[in-house]
Amino acid sequence: MENPDDRYLWKTDKEEFFPKLTVYELAIGFFRFLIFVSYTLCSIPLFLLAKILFNQTGIKKPMVIIRRYWSLVTLRLCSLKIKVKGTFSSEVCLVVCNHISWLDILAIQSIADVVFVAKSDVKNWPGLGFLAKLANTLFVERNPQKIGLHSEQANVILSNGNSVCFFPEGTSSDGLRVLKFRSGFFQLAFNSLGEKKVNIIDIQPLSIFYEPKNSDMRIDFYGWWGNMSLFLHILKVLCKSSGIVSLNFHKLLKSDRFQNRKQLASKAEDIIRDELTFNIEKSRIR
């Protein structure tokens, strides 16, 4: 029997859904794109200047503010409103989230100051790769021999007082399901961190859900998976998008109450899946 999750493993040949776009929608999309490019080109020098002036002093607020407003403006250009439930932890933690599309980064970044973990392929994406590097993203390779190196890099980030956000599904989906969590990176919750010997980092599950508002948009409209074209997905979001992205910051999971990373990963997965199921059912009732 075919595994229904196989279509999210970046090897599907199924044709992706792409809505018909009117001339008006194409014009709107092009206008939004021009604003995005202009705003981004203005934001990059400001961000780099803030980085030069404040990076050595340990003051992060100017960079965080610039990054946050850039993300919020970009979300609004995509006609997405953001709704937040819960509170991002003020303690250093590992944030784990279900993954739906490239929009997740913008939504999370508009609220939380975190360092993202991304697959190494992302740094080669035109435009987006450069922006990811600028944000100090930790790029990881899917190579078992590199796990030790990547864990060490993440430990340094955590020991410097930065929370780390990663997507344990290992890929993105249609937003209507949560794929099986990979437990590898959860080991960071139990690792020793530098000279301070802080050996417990708590986990904050974060569930994300997109709710389209246009009646002609499918409920999986924002999902980007398999070998879908990144360009076409960005195009349809800019031209036709209208909806809400909901972020739910759940209570911290105390890592010292779990025996190992697999138990911790399983609990985080259950919390996020339950929240996603609730949101899907609620949106269908309306």
Language-model-derived ranges and their functions:
Residues 47-53, 57-63, 77, 93-145, ...:
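Catalytic core of membrane glycerolipid acyltransferases/transacylases, capturing the structured
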Residues 154-155, 162-164, 168-177, 181:
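Soluble extracytoplasmic domains of inner/organellar membrane proteins
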Residues 137-163:
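A membrane-cytosol interface segment of integral membrane proteins
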Residues 92-94, 163-167, 202:
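Residue-level preference for the first positions of well-ordered beta-strands
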Residues 127-129, 143, 175-259:
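A cross-family acyltransferase "interaction/gating" segment
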Residues 1-18, 70, 77, 81-85, ...:
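Soluble, non-transmembrane catalytic domains of enzymes that act on hydrophobic metabolites at membranes
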Residues 14-83, 130-134, 240-242:
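A transmembrane-helix-recognition feature enriched in membrane-embedded lipid enzymes
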